Amino acid sequence: FPPWVL
């Protein structure tokens, strides 16, 4: 998943 979902 991309980092902006964290």
UniProtKB/Swiss-Prot annotation:
Tissue expression remark: Expressed by the skin glands.
Family to which this protein belongs: Belongs to the frog skin active peptide (FSAP) family. Tryptophillin subfamily.
Protein name: Tryptophyllin-14
GO CC annotation, single: extracellular region
Keywords: Amidation, Amphibian defense peptide, Secreted
Single GO BP term: defense response
Organism per entry: Pithecopus centralis
Residue(s) carrying Leucine amide: 6
Domain of life: Eukaryota
Localization per record: Secreted
